[in-house]
């Protein structure tokens, strides 16, 4: 197993948010554009930990967080005397969703919508999977945005959508299954508007990425741009340029010239209208 995968695995399975700096971790951070150096340590946000997981899966075909005991305490109780041996959190297996516009969920045979400011947490086996595929689906990377889903300025084609948090622990499995069955024309991803975020969007290989509709107007002068974050993503920028084409390649080149890195939170807080770019 490559040293990078082993290092990411130890971080994720150990539930850690920081590591000591070293050659391996410096390489990982240069490649992915995540992590904040604090003295002799590198600190990661929950979203960055999820990016590390996706990086490992995309680059090496391995899930560094896989654990055969996954499934929660109820599942563990069926074959072990101590249900507390499960590494899962109490609510970690629940999917976190919201419904925008006229979209709705079918949960345990009932139609469900979410009022503004609220979200729904549900077991994946309670969802009507066939109905789910008929709805538009927007995957949000930053879970902190979920209570503010109504403020996301979705493009017209995704105005009526189920909004689903991408997850960061056990619920990632349920999200992955839903995404695998979702029609590409009914799927969109909302990541940071920076090299790392859009490279991660390309890794998905399906659906569309949501970007600012007027991205050409964003630049070094933009007050909520984070050029320092952009400069830490040189390897991710190269990966994006090497793989992107069309509008996404033009975006990558614009990011490079303007040192652009705009977080999802700022796009939502400032009511920036989004546009959908197909990934394939």
Q: What is each stretch, according to the model?
A:
Residues 187-192:
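Terminal interaction module
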């Amino acid at each position: 197993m490559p040293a990078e995968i082993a290092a990411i695995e130890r971080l994720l399975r150990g539930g850690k948010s920081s590591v000591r700096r070293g050659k391996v971790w410096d390489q990982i951070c240069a490649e992915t554009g995540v992590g904040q150096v604090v003295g002799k340590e590198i600190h990661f946000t929950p979203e960055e930990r999820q990016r590390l997981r996706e990086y490992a899966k995309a680059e090496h075909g391995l899930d560094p967080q896989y654990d055969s005991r996954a499934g929660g305490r109820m599942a563990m109780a069926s074959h072990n005397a101590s249900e507390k041996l499960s590494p899962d959190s109490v609510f970690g297996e629940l999917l976190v969703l919201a419904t925008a516009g006229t979209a709705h969920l079918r949960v345990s045979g009932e139609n469900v919508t979410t009022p503004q400011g609220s979200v729904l947490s549900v077991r994946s086996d309670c969802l009507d999977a066939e109905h789910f595929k008929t709805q538009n689906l927007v995957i949000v990377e930053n879970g902190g945005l979920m209570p503010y889903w109504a403020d996301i300025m979705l493009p017209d084609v995704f105005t009526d959508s189920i909004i689903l948090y991408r997850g960061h622990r056990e619920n990632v499995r349920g999200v992955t299954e839903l995404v695998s069955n979702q029609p590409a024309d009914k799927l969109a991803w909302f990541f940071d508007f920076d090299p790392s975020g859009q490279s991660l969007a390309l890794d998905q290989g399906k659906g569309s990425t949501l970007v600012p509709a007027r991205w050409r107007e964003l630049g070094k002068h933009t007050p909520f741009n984070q050029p320092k974050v952009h400069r830490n993503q040189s390897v991710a920028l190269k990966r994006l340029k090497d793989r992107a084409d069309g509008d996404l390649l033009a975006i990558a080149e614009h990011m490079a010239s303007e040192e652009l890195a705009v977080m999802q939170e700022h796009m939502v807080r400032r009511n920036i209208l989004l546009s959908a770019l197909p990934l394939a």
